[in-house]
Amino acid sequence: VHIGGRPDPLRFTGVDTPETVDPDQPPECFGAEASAHTTELLPVGTAVRLTRDVEARDRYDRLLVYLERAEDGLFVNLDLVAGGWADDYPYPPNVAHQRDFALAASRARTDGLGLWGTCGDADTPVG
């Protein structure tokens, strides 16, 4: 995301997507697909609304955000979990939407969506 014309890295609060950019590890199962889906949802130039929970940044200085696509209000964090592109990830004290994320993750897991139907053990989303 760009704020004031400068890039500022972010993390979607409350969700855990498979890792794809750790230089010391191979990409995790379904990581490329989750990244492609996110890029499809948010092509360069997409207007978004960012909201935060309790904390503004994580220990890596990334913005912790709930992200909505401005044109239609799509709640991207929830979309990622509901489609099986990510798992829910409680990050206290930033838990305003955690109940919704946990329910969406449970449904995606039960239905075998996304990473849950691709990465083997239904209780182990990535790795």
Label each region the model flagged.
Residues V1-G127:
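Small beta-barrel nucleic-acid-binding modules, primarily SNase/OB-fold domains
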